[in-house]
Amino acid sequence: MSPKTETKASVGFKAGVKDYRLTYYTPEYQTKDTDILAAFRVTPQPGVPAEEAGAAVAAESSTGTWTTVWTDGLTSLDRYKGRCYDIEPVPGEETQFIAYVAYPLDLFEEGSVTNLFTSIVGNVFGFKALRALRLEDLRIPPAYSKTFQGPPHGIQVERDKLNKYGRPLLGCTIKPKLGLSAKNYGRAVYECLRGGLDFTKDDENVNSQPFMRWRDRFVFCAEAIYKAQAETGEIKGHYLNATAGTCEEMMKRAVFARELGVPIVMHDYLTGGFTANTSLAHYCRDNGLLLHIHRAMHAVIDRQRNHGMHFRVLAKALRMSGGDHIHAGTVVGKLEGERDVTLGFVDLLRDDFIEKDRSRGIYFTQDWVSMPGVLPVASGGIHVWHMPALTEIFGDDSVLQFGGGTLGHPWGNAPGAVANRVALEACVQARNEGRDLAREGNEVIREACKWSPELAAACEIWKEIKFEFDVIDRL
């Protein structure tokens, strides 16, 4: 570089390191309707001021780096930088606070959850100045959400396809999840569907293993679906897991499912990745397939209160990336989920407009405009005694899935399905008659047992099964 060039490069530029808060902490900033807003739970290292830590998050997740660079002068940082515009303490946690960060829309590629997360959570979580960092919520503006297709079909279109209204949908995960041959797997699918379930399901890790290759499973499950439909007169489905080691293989499995004429496929969206999931969702929209989403690996990301990402953020990301169902916890079963928090992100999945409500963990008002909704799936350690609570908590627009609670019935798979269908119909009827399921639920189930021996047997076998542990994810 010539001396003349060096002089020009140094005009208005002072090398060195300066506090992030001098540039990225802007409490006077008024957020715009087009900004993406983030709420971070920040735990700074001892001696790091709250303003500096919040500004560091804004900087490292947008335009900043650890030192001043002269190329800052070649762009407009005021236009593109993230801004920490507010900081508030976390009640009961002296070392934690919530940092609110606003990101200008131009920082993100349209229609790409992958790019959104790479920017906002891709690098900053390893920052040494922070002991821990958790993304609690995102506000996605309509200007950005409209660049996504969203769910392939949505709740109303799914009900129309299935011709099922006025009640939750009923499902079952085939167990044991691994080890069955394709033919025996298909037999279990048939028995459960024949007994009265709407859906059966591959578990998240059922892909294409030596004991059951994917093509064989798809064929036997399709046979089971058609046989059960012919015998019951109801539309049935099985979530055929298309998740694979490559996107090309995943799409090949989805194409084969469509050729078989089945109504729904499945994807593990976190282990499979957002790019793969969005591609599959677009294919499902174009080809009339419903898309069931499993959240395998979510607890690695969202379980800890002070680090990672809350599931409400993953739920919003899924609604944009695309899925017609997603597992959302049960509140009453074996998996983590506090009631108010769970219902907060259930509303974020289903509703068009969700008001800010900190009592349910919703940090921002979210307007999805016309994006279709996603059915929440309650699954994990639930059985017939849970049916009143599940019906009352989740309402009609949900899928209730009983794996062990169906296949663990003492009389077999079909009677297990009958027991769950009878329990569901009894709870829906009682609710429609004005009865309080939260208070009278057990009595509703006992009354139904009088005319359903299958339900009576299920109630007897699971009458003392409870999962009573403290919930970690509290507000």
Swiss-Prot record:
The modification N-acetylproline is found at P3. GO terms for cellular component: chloroplast. Transmembrane segments: none annotated. Residues 1-2 form a propeptide. The keyword Disulfide bond applies. One of its GO terms (molecular function) is monooxygenase activity. Its main location: plastid. Its EC number is 4.1.1.39. The record marks K334 as: Transition state stabilizer. The active site is at K175 (proton acceptor), H294 (proton acceptor). Binds 1 Mg(2+) ion per subunit. It comes from the Eukaryota. The modification N6-carboxylysine is found at K201. It catalyses: 2 (2R)-3-phosphoglycerate + 2 H(+) = D-ribulose 1,5-bisphosphate + CO2 + H2O; D-ribulose 1,5-bisphosphate + O2 = 2-phosphoglycolate + (2R)-3-phosphoglycerate + 2 H(+). Heterohexadecamer of 8 large chains and 8 small chains; disulfide-linked. The disulfide link is formed within the large subunit homodimers. RuBisCO catalyzes two reactions: the carboxylation of D-ribulose 1,5-bisphosphate, the primary event in carbon dioxide fixation, as well as the oxidative fragmentation of the pentose substrate in the photorespiration process. Both reactions occur simultaneously and in competition at the same active site. This is Ribulose bisphosphate carboxylase large chain. It comes from Pinus longaeva (Great Basin bristlecone pine).
